Amino acid sequence: MSTRWAIRADRAFDGRGFVRGGLTVVVETDRIVGVEPGMCVLPPDVPLTEVDGTLLPGLVDCHVHLVAAGTFPGSPGSLEWAGAAGASALDDVITTNLRAQVAAGVTTVRDLGDVDFRVLGHRGRKGEGLPRVVAAGPPLTIPAGHCHYLGGVVDPDEPGSLERAVAERVERGVDVVKVMASGGFLTPGSDQLGAQFELAPLRRLVDLVHAAGLRIVAHTHSVPGAEVAVAAGADGLEHFTCLAQGGAAAPTELLERVAAAGMTVDPTLGNDPSRFPPVSDMPPHILEMLARLGITDRDEHFARAARNTLRLREHGIRVVSGLDAGANPAKPHGLLWKSVAELVRGGWPVDEAVATATSAAADDCGVEAGRLEAGHLADLLVVDGDLSTDVTALGRPSAVWLGGVEVMSARPHPG
């Protein structure tokens, strides 16, 4: 008896583009072994599942914080809270967040900031129907720098500090390394408009990480932070907000350098506006920073950020999607589709936007997923509606397969 099975949909996205007439995808164990035109004839011993909606690869969220549930600093569930939470509490939060991700069609997450390397122990939970995890451990930052409370502090002026930090990550078995090249909104006192590292120590850190066979991505909210990360040879830029006094926009020369270096940018777009607190309830340091930046209309700021990503596309820069899930109240886990929708709102074609959360994202995370292609992992997603004409369909998952095993279904089954 054949161990193969197939799934057929009249509408499909293969990871790079929409396929006219749909596809039939043949699966054996955890891999795709064949991809055929929609109405192909299958051997009689290959069971077929026919689905409505749009079939596509499972989504890949390139920027999550599994130890946090998305609240402001100091509140239970925040990144700052996670820095002092016990192991059991962290494990519960991580598991809850992984469940939220897979329920939203996300089959791989890249965690870019935990506590005590706690997330690494949650890799390999596919048997429980939970997403694959690519993990960085605690992000590297300077004393009192952004997210210092997560435990990844290094002192660039202390001999051996960078070497010890990289050696620990290699010993722990991280999949990627993250460094905070600028300050951030979530850490009072950090410099969101400057650079946290001088070029020489950051270049030394990048060289150490590369010598260990790992990639390094840099948190960059400011123009100076992005400039030093590019000059140091980092592999990717997270946020790339390019904040400066009076606004946020990437200088053309910086975009040209990012493109020439072949770097990947994750703009971490997307949020749930209904979860934003009233401005009067926001922490004072965030209100102060918004005033320094001249941001008076939150909605217009986000719309401008979406439009700004067109400049990345125009310069040929590789873009991937990650929500920064768990970082604040408006970024709960399982909302990656909003990142893709923001690209479309900014002017991206739907197929290119969806690719940032499938094939491009999988490549950047180093996983053999993100494509409906023979040899790739059978991480599959069905969404309700025609994704090619309605990007919000990405937020309506009806079935999810992880490594060929159905782990979520909201669709009716025969009998």
Kindly label every feature range from the protein language model.
Residues 78-92, 147-164, 215-217:
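Active-site mouth loops of central-metabolism enzymes
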Residues 10, 349, 354-359, 374-415:
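C-terminal cap of metal-dependent C-N hydrolases
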Residues 288-293, 302-386:
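His/Asp/Glu-enriched, well-ordered alpha-helical/loop segment
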Residues 1-43, 54-55, 385-390, 405-406:
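N-terminal metal-binding scaffold of metallo-dependent hydrolase/deaminase domains
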Residues 147-203, 235-238:
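Active-site gating/metal-coordination segments in enzymes
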Residues 90-120, 130-139, 174-187, 214-215, ...:
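Divalent metal-dependent hydrolysis catalytic cores, especially in the metallo-beta-lactamase
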Residues 54-125, 229-232:
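Metal-associated gating/positioning segment near the N- to mid-region
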Residues 188-303, 320, 325-327, 347, ...:
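Active-site core of metal-dependent hydrolases
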